[in-house]
Amino acid sequence: MLSFVAQRIVKGAIVLLAIIVLNFFLIRLAPGDPAVVMAGEAGAGDQVFVTQLREKFGLDRPLPEQLFLYVKGILSLDLGFSFRQQTPVSKLIMDRLPATLLLTMTAFAISLLLGILLGTLAARWAGTWADTAITVLALVFYATPLFWIALMAILLFSVALDWLPSFGYETVGANYTGLAHMLDVGAHLIMPAMTIGLFFMATYARMTRASMLEVKRLDFVKTARAKGLSDNVIQRRHVLRNALLPVVTLAGLHSGTLIGGAVLTETVFAWPGIGRLMYEALLQRDYNLLLGVFVVCSAMVLIFNLVTDLVYRMVDPRIDFAA
């Protein structure tokens, strides 16, 4: 297993380097000049001041040299300075990362648990009204845009019913501590986490249902039933365990999409995570901050995929890492 993990880390480093190079040039070649944006905000749009800003931040250097200096900085865990906020990019990201991790991990748990539960029930009651209801529900959430789910949730639970706060990470000026603070954050977390969770739940429910129905037709399930095992035991020990492999694969593939969904959700709910930070950096043409967020998000996706491969081994012990 250690050799497998080491190989994946090396491959991940190569992929991460390719992502850095690609995004570096894409961001630099995009329309807009951060020096012009900063000069305009400072109220000094003359060309001399713009030139001084470009020299200060190294934007006047050739792109290959800028890339070399950036990669060299990453090797020492230095993501550079934010052009707009004049703060180390790593500090800005670390300040926002806990909020994003809390949101994405909660949403992932909701989507996976609800998806597997509903998919299992749909497979067990295949062909009945319950199966139809679950399938229709999954299709509705799957076909609805993420931002629309977020807006409808705000209108229903915040505006109409006044049950939940509509934006932010915590109540501004409340100064809660201990359990009260946890409950306050939890109340703010419910809507954004459920928005992402329900969107991805639909995919997991459909995949679980289809996979379980396929496994049910295999010979080893018929053998288990011939031995007199109860339906509950067959479903839990044999069908569900083997049906989870495609779901685990899909969960690994969705890691990048989950972070992408966080960008939209954090923007709608004003959730102070790195998704919203990415959106702000894009509007401000803050190259270093935008690229730093890309690097961190890419690293998170690679780590998540590695964890997915390890979970494979837990779900199916027959998988050999040395293969």
Residue ranges and their predicted role:
Residues 2-4, 93-130, 159-162, 173-323:
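Alpha-helical transmembrane segments of integral membrane proteins
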Residues 6-12:
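N-terminal signal-anchor/signal peptide hydrophobic helix marking the start
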Residues 9, 49, 53, 63-79, ...:
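Hydrophobic alpha-helical segments of integral membrane proteins
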Residues 12, 20, 43-44, 112, ...:
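Residue-level recognition of pore/gate-forming positions within transmembrane alpha-helices
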Residues 16-68, 161-182:
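Hydrophobic alpha-helical transmembrane segments of membrane transport/permease proteins
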Residues 22-29, 57-58, 70-72, 137-167, ...:
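Membrane-water interface segments at the C-terminal ends of transmembrane alpha-helices
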Residues 40-58, 135-144, 191-197, 233-250:
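Hydrophobic alpha-helical transmembrane segments
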Residues 59-116:
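An internal, D/E-rich "acidic patch" concept
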